[in-house]
Amino acid sequence: MAQALDNSPSYPSGEAVDFAVVGSGSAGGIMAKELSMAGFSVVILEQGPHLQAADFTHDEWSIKHNFELEWDWRKGHPQTFRRTENETAVVGDSSLRYAHNVGGSSVHYSGNFWRLREIDFIEASVRGPIAGTNFVDWPITYAELEPYYTKVDWEIGLSGLQGPWDPPRSRDYPCPPMPVKSPGVLLERAAKKLGYTPYPAPVAILSQPHNGRPGCIHCGFCNGYGCEVNAKSSTAVTMLPLALASGNCELRTECTVSRINTNAVGRVTEVVYWEADGTEVAQRANAVVLCANGAETPRLLLMSATGSFPDGLANSSGMVGKNLMFNGYTQVIGLFDEPIHAYKSVPVTRVVHDFWTLDESLGFYGGGGIDSRHPYGGNLIAAGLGGGLFGGPSWGSDYKRSLRQLFTHSCSFDGHTTSLPLASNNVTLDPNVQDMWGRPAIRVTY
């Protein structure tokens, strides 16, 4: 982490900066760093607080029940969900789980850091069209993107080892892979026995000191938690310190953006937001970069509709918010006679990517990877909220005994798969539900 002095300016909201960046996560943090270090004036608008390493604790109840690092849909930030457009969306947990703090979800995610393969960029050309989908090639190739993958690897800090199915890379990982933990050993043994090729998982967690940050202390509180020693390579501890030290970047926290305004010729002029006390501010900017994740970005574009842009900004195609794609997820949990203690250390240390591209003769599309981990992210509270052993007791001493067994003797094997782009899977504005600021709630149809 850059330990330079925070030399950030304070820009008047009524004077246009070169760039207003909405969001400080994986995209926003990098964008702010690149722009500010190139000499541009930048204001970052972040909806959450600026938490430091000392703020990150092992409080399982706060994290897993109260969603301390996320927007809690139960407390002023509702989301609605429906499976088809013929249904009425209902308020609930829609699976849009993202952090609200400086660094965004790069602060609380598991650290898995897989590269796409060459085929992923040209798959439509190779496989042909898929009826009923908007399946197309990327406008760039893996070869064009590879230098930037490597730049990210080294600047934020990754640990790993080139695997047998990995695409070409111009430089090795900056840090060696994490030591293998018990779920990784189980996956490795089973995969090799079946003829597959497991290898060390690439993770955005430091196995050794890098760029002034320490290596992992293997506390086990990664998935859903911020890192108490800054070994997890979030943009909050990698990119943003450099941006703020440039003298060209101002970070404003707890700013809830409501809309993006344009002038008579359709050019963006300002971002309107509320401060924590409800004061409305309009920050003028020559350009606006939306880095508010795959849900909040379309929400802001749709909320910025005007007479000139009746369907929202940048939506002449009608595609804003459509073709929503999730990480397909299948989990098998094994309960072992002997203790596994899978909750220790980082979530994942071994992966199997033999199934990244499947045999088309199987009759369906897509592939993915497999990893092994603790089924409840190493959190006893999460295991308890999950009900303990399947079909087992749910109260009393027998329940506590079964919960201890589940927590210490279980291991999950998790499949991460592709999903197809369908216009019917989308993020739109709910016409009937609003958040605490009066903004239309995010409505997920999937």
Predicted regions located by residue number:
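Extreme N-terminal leader/targeting segments of oxidoreductases
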Residues: M1-F19, M37-A38, S62-K64
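N-terminal Rossmann-like FAD-binding beta1-loop-alpha1 element of flavoenzymes
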Residues: F19-I44
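Glycine-rich loop(s) and the adjacent beta-strand/alpha-helix scaffold that form part
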Residues: M37, S41, G48-S62, S246, ...
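Conserved N-terminal glycine-rich FAD pyrophosphate-binding loop of Rossmann-like flavoproteins
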Residues: P49-D72, A99-N112
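Short, solvent-exposed loop/turn and secondary-structure capping segments
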Residues: A53-T57, S105, S110-N112, D120-F121, ...
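Conserved redox-cofactor binding core of oxidoreductases
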Residues: E68, W73, T80, T84-G92, ...
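FAD cofactor-binding and catalytic pocket of flavoenzymes
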Residues: T84-Y98, V102-S105, Y109, R115, ...
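Short, hydrophobic/aromatic-rich segments at coil-to-beta transitions
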Residues: G266-V272, S410
